[in-house]
Amino acid sequence: MVADLTSDISESQEQETETNSANNNGAVFRPENCPRLVIKIGSSLLVDQRGQVRRDWLQTVAYDIAKLHQAGQQIIVVSSGAIALGARRLNLPRGGRASLEDAQASASVGQILLSQCWAELLGACSLDSSQILLTLDDLEDRRRYLNVSATLDRLLSLGVVPVINENDSIATAEIRFGDNDRLAARIGQASHASGVILFSDVDGLYTANPMKDPNAKRIDRVEHIDNSTEAMASSDSASGMGSGGMASKVEAARIATYSGVNLAITTGKRPSPLTMFLDDGAGTLFTADESASAHKTWLAGRLTAHGQVYIDQGAVEALHDGNSLLPAGVCSIEGKFNRGDVVDILDQEHNLIARGLIEYDSEDSAQITGKRSQEIADILGYEARTALIHRNHMVML
């Protein structure tokens, strides 16, 4: 069936004209344009009013993922639904949200059910899946951010589909509707994805509530999020989505596009929603800021450097060629820092070359300065990462 679906989408893509492809929001997220994609599925789509998984619908999502995986696209799933599933199993009122304790207990039980469901449905498509539980704080701490990024890279390189959810069983402030929108954007940032798709019960951002205003129009593309965009998504706007709905999605779009990642809001209320969106592009696309300043602002502007790494001319040239910084090219280290801190990278004339997140603390960095990769494990006494600063966690200045 996966092969048939792959054939179907290939044929439909070939039939599109060049003009339609250029104007189609969905084309931005196809494998040839988006090698790594994050999709977010909310509770209202995954779980019905009785607290049961919409398995038939979710199976079509699994088929979508499988055919795109077969086409070479790496996909990460951010999945809600644990609290709703756990609440039904425990017979708790108000969907498990009557109290913080109920929500945490529901999440603890529901996470197993959710993970089993994804593993079964993706397994039926010959795909392995993994479970990662995070809170937004995990991606704010730079050391944990590096670990999340490295884990995702390895899983995706092994052909695994990571399924990520908030760790609601221990989270407090994070337990509120919409957090997985922001989490999906953060995952897009940490995984260096090209795109994030938020599947929702609405098909995009509207100028007004389309259920009440016949003149409401969907905004197909947003190139810059400004006050008017936020006003349409606010809780007191005519769209009526509230702070837990469209407002969180627009905030997610701000996070994603700020980091150079395209984000789309589209409907999930149809079978094979991923395939359908790639075909018709029905939704709102928030376009990525692809300028260097966006990445500099994220890494260089918002964070304070905790140390300095001085490198030789060969390393300078290697960095300009897009390579990671290896210990062999380092001449000296200054400052006191921990793994995951931001450090400045300078040449021997003290010119600032780049800034990045370092993989070792200052003590270990000093020990391996100027050393070749094969020497690192013997020096430190443990199997360590090859790069001192990975190219994915570095911005040239």
From Swiss-Prot:
UniProt xrefs under SMART domains: PUA (SM00359)
Chain positions covered by the region annotation Disordered: 1-28
Keywords: Amino-acid biosynthesis, ATP-binding, Cytoplasm, Kinase, Nucleotide-binding, Proline biosynthesis, Transferase
UniProt binding sites for substrate: S80, D168, N180
Residues holding ATP: K40, S200, D201, S243, G244, G245, M246, A247, S248, K249
GO-annotated cellular components: cytosol
CDD domains: AAK_G5K_ProB, PUA_G5K
Record domain PUA: where: 306-383
An example molecular function term from Gene Ontology annotations: glutamate 5-kinase activity
Subcellular location field: Cytoplasm
Pfam families listed in its UniProt record: AA_kinase (PF00696), PUA (PF01472)
Entry EC number(s): 2.7.2.11
The protein's annotated pathway: Amino-acid biosynthesis; L-proline biosynthesis; L-glutamate 5-semialdehyde from L-glutamate: step 1/2
NCBIfam families referenced in this protein's UniProt entry, alphabetically: proB
Role of this protein: Catalyzes the transfer of a phosphate group to glutamate to form L-glutamate 5-phosphate.
Name of protein: Glutamate 5-kinase
The gene coding this protein: proB
